Amino acid sequence: MNLLNLFNPLQTAGMEEEFDAIKIGIASPETIRSWSYGEVKKPETINYRTFKPERDGLFCAKIFGPVKDYECLCGKYKRLKFKGVTCEKCGVEVTLSKVRRERMGHIELAAPVAHIWFLKSLPSRLGMVLDMTLRDIERVLYFEAFVVTDPGMTPLQRRQLLTEDDYYNKLDEYGDDFDAKMGAEGIRELLRTLNVAGEIEILRQELESTGSDTKIKKIAKRLKVLEAFHRSGMKLEWMIMDVLPVLPPDLRPLVPLDGGRFATSDLNDLYRRVINRNNRLKRLLELHAPDIIVRNEKRMLQEAVDSLLDNGRRGKAMTGANKRPLKSLADMIKGKGGRFRQNLLGKRVDYSGRSVITVGPYLRLHQCGLPKKMALELFKPFIFHKLEKQGLASTVKAAKKLVEQEVPEVWDILEEVIREHPIMLNRAPTLHRLGIQAFEPILIEGKAIQLHPLVCAAFNADFDGDQMAVHVPLSLEAQMEARTLMLASNNVLSPANGEPIIVPSQDIVLGLYYMTRDRINAKGEGSLFADVKEVHRAYHTKQVELGTKITVRLREWVKNEAGEFEPVVNRYETTVGRALLSEILPKGLPFEYVNKALKKKEISKLINASFRLCGLRDTVIFADHLMYTGFGFAAKGGISIAVDDMEIPKEKAALLAEANAEVKEIEDQYRQGLVTNGERYNKVVDIWGRAGDKIAKAMMDNLSKQKVIDRAGNEVDQESFNSIYMMADSGARGSAAQIKQLSGMRGLMAKPDGSIIETPITSNFREGLTVLQYFIATHGARKGLADTALKTANSGYLTRRLVDVTQDLVVVEDDCGTSDGFVMKAVVQGGDVIEALRDRILGRVTASDVVDPSSGETLVEAGTLLTEKLVDMIDQSGVDEVKVRTPITCKTRHGLCAHCYGRDLARGKLVNAGEAVGVIAAQSIGEPGTQLTMRTFHIGGAASRAAAASQVEAKSNGTARFSSQMRYVANNKGELVVIGRSCEVVIHDDIGRERERHKVPYGAILLVQDGMAIKAGQTLATWDPHTRPMITEHAGMVKFENVEEGVTVAKQTDDVTGLSTLVVIDGKRRSSSASKLLRPTVKLLDENGVEICIPGTSTPVSMAFPVGAVITVREGQEIGKGDVLARIPQASSKTRDITGGLPRVAELFEARVPKDAGMLAEITGTVSFGKETKGKQRLIVTDVDGVAYETLISKEKQILVHDGQVVNRGETIVDGAVDPHDILRLQGIEALARYIVQEVQEVYRLQGVKISDKHIEVIIRQMLRRVNIADAGETGFITGEQVERGDVMAANEKALEEGKEPARYENVLLGITKASLSTDSFISAASFQETTRVLTEAAIMGKQDELRGLKENVIVGRLIPAGTGLTYHRSRHQQWQEVEQETAETQVTDE
């Protein structure tokens, strides 16, 4: 390091200081003066003739330093030998001109001025400290009122406002007994005379005595600010400024343009205004001008300083000559173009270039093709060095010349330099860490970068004109990291789900599929071959075809006990293509993996298996060979598309006719009044949806089979070799949905709002569309395009918020030693096991022993990482649930431990210390978001909606069980009618494991009994999907109450049918105010005309009709249990797609309270209903001890419980979306985590995107990182404040050690934006959002940033404390501790 110091004249001692934290505070006037090198007295900038700075002006050389290196302004002293001399003529110190970037000046203000950030940044800090409203403070500051600063012996109050008239009246009355001031002086006086310590005492006492919640909150806020001031030793009056610092001139440059004009930074304008007004005010004060004039000038000065600090925050923004607002100091640092995001977090780097990408099908996975021109430019310094070293050039200049002339030696040297020097390729947008990968460059001619096709999936690149950037790692360490961590061949698995991301697609898949398909009766069928070489010869001499079925002897390599490979020879029935493919299989991969037609999914499985069985190196080589082979056979196969390949099924006409007939029938029923218009629409849409599916099925059946003659001469079906079918079937391109549009029928289309147009497009693209059909189609297709453009931005913003909330989460230790965890079960939805238990626990660490349910022996001990082998064993033993460790319950303070996180998905083993798991989680969730937004636009607006379900069927054999919430009654026909709201039928297999779980809606008819044995395919329950019934649980005679035509119900006569029905009117729409409160209800009478009561109570049965219900019973009608009283038509369905998805994910992570949230029971107890109020019902839950909890529920909402029902705490009692905050409060962290994980996964699953639960849990951990102090105990916290969980834990441990009372706290769920802003690091929060507010708050609190996260370290320009940087930080920390210890020891010896 000493050598460097010689060459760096600025390197005075102490420039290289190491620091461990950054503290922010309010600068005192003394501090500001100590920074300054002189006072700026004049608004002049530079002399426009000589271009020299004016003295005492904004660019003064005397204050800020010389304009030219080592040269004073008048030119008396020049050169290095006068370094440090101050010229006696012009007063300029002879030194480097770059001091003009760091020397500050100051302006002495003639009157104090309030700092706008402390005044206007909400909540107003000045207002908080003084306990005055913002409006009042502004009136004082801007000279509209006086404030009493010292009431003396008068009855006036301190801080009381007086208008001018009041003030003069009081002056007459009391004379000089009191003091009142105007402007910033008045506020400053109030601040100066406030006794902080005393005020804190008073507030603490008030806190204990007061009972009102709002008051507690208000006092706690004020207390926090005052305590911060008290602790940090900052004075309150520093929020009012006497001195204004002036930014160094080179940071607000003035550049002469040609033509005698100047380009200047807006700050100079703002400073000029301040100086002008300040000087004018000084003169006015010297002249003893009248009060009113001085006041006006002071107000103008205040406004000028406001504009300089934060233009436009108060009043109108100051504008320059061109009418746009001037850019103030605050604007310089905030927003996307501000200092934080533009310059500190987003730097541009040298040694980089970009170019278009093309395919490099002959490359190996770790290589890329780099154009010679680019390489020459990028590796210049290395080439210069080599040229000098070999003596071809004596100076850098000479070397430069040689390179420019491109002499032959230069190319040889370039080859040498480039060898084994990895470069990094990046494609924007970089959505996850695989968006930048390292490759070894291969020099190529031309100007395009060649990219290996298999990494396209990771970069999301295609070759339609995409560009990529190249970066060169310079230092040895950087090259090493690029090679070991970032080389493409080291990134085979995706960090999001642990599956291979190096997976063949498109042509490669098509080639491999074509190669491994079998043909019936191909040339040479049934031949026997001794080995693969023989197959080769036969194929090349055209004795056999690629798809010929043959028998062949193959040698495979199998591991023995010792783990060494041994050859095993087997005979296989296979095809020629598969036998040829067997040659490239790595050792240890069984042939049966390729002995089938390889589709995209199969190939992915193949690569996965290869990675697990044969390791990384072999897999990479294998993937490359797969690619070469695939491309080769895709070329030989000659698969193309012709119009004739789109075969239209013969059954189409019949199916359309059938659908038309059904629609006609529904229309007839509608005319007769048997169905409402809404039901008609729903049924029509369903019919067309089904017809489309049937045609699609007929088409696919037709496409996928073709008739051929086999060897015996019989006609048989074989899988088709239709090009379009092969493309879709192999997964290379296209899907059944797209083929359906080509040769089936286009089907139903959606309007831009998502509702479905009921007339479908019956033609397909091959037949062509009529004008009307074409118009309907464009409707949806254009929406797709518009959506994509709009949604990409949203998705990027979601990723940004996620990264920001998790950026400081790093694995810092091996094991935190907790035994907490979550219990994992398989995810069962509808009839299917959506995610098996094995997939959910793979790569996790067990939190408790896993015990075999049948034998009771321990299968896996606690603390074991679950590998594929162990998971399979658990799966076979029939274990239903496993308790695993999770990031949410990890006890590590700052960061995570490896055991709670589990396996590093991209590497396949336990995660290493230093892995930035937070950022990986954020990227894994954010990256598919962008993909999902683009997915919609490819199908082109075709409606994708499942026909509404009207029944559930069992999918497997077993025993039917009813869930605990199941309630049903038997009606007169003997059918079981469900009357519970959240009922489920669960099916268990013979061992008793849950296999299926089906929701059955209210009003469904059950076709099975509890405990009944059932077969697969048996219907369990049926219901009407389009209406929701209202069912009676008691029998009797109908008696209506408040069912008055024209008041509470309307008689609706259908124009088409002439039939009338009674429909309940919405209370808000009713005419008279009295009728708004009436609720149409139905009561039941027995044969004597007495009201029937609920059994066991004296409450009469009374059921209210909901709004919009169509009443189906008449007054006086006899009804039995389970009969339908009314039908509520369901709204028509819309198409579901990721639009519902992305905002849904954002909503979950932002922890927003849903619009019409449902309600959960606060306590466990019995439900009863109390006295109703206007428009609300009173629901009461009484627990065992008789404590009642009551709540009012608006009548529009659907209550899911009934009188006398027992509910558990946290059970849903009012229908609606669940509020996550309620789940956390009533059911705890595990239930909350399960809810969020499930909901987020559902969105992604709908799109077929796999993300590990782990990543979502990491984010939930960050959302739960703060807690609310419920009772501070004897710790230093304030009751009601929000603090980091780790801080409370630490404080409680300390309190318990000292025998004090620990604090009690409640969990809080914060949305990701809020969590990012409430982080302890103010640098991280300020660079995220609301910069002004964050910095203001931090300055007042005198916050210290410990630089723990990644972001803060990037901003201060250090290695990040993750990955290889973690060791650097740790060693520094250790050294620091050792130094501290030494100093402590020396002090002891000194004493």
UniProtKB/Swiss-Prot annotation:
Coiled-coil stretches: none
Cofactor descriptive note: Binds 1 Mg(2+) ion per subunit. Binds 2 Zn(2+) ions per subunit.
Catalysed reactions, as listed in the record: RNA(n) + a ribonucleoside 5'-triphosphate = RNA(n+1) + diphosphate
Gene3D superfamilies cross-referenced by the UniProt entry: 1.10.132.30, 1.10.150.390, 1.10.1790.20, 1.10.40.90, 2.40.40.20, 2.40.50.100, RNA polymerase II, clamp domain, RNA polymerase Rpb1, domain 3
Cofactor: Mg(2+); Zn(2+)
Top-level enzyme category: transferase
Family affiliation: Belongs to the RNA polymerase beta' chain family.
Function: DNA-dependent RNA polymerase catalyzes the transcription of DNA into RNA using the four ribonucleoside triphosphates as substrates.
Name of the protein in question: DNA-directed RNA polymerase subunit beta'
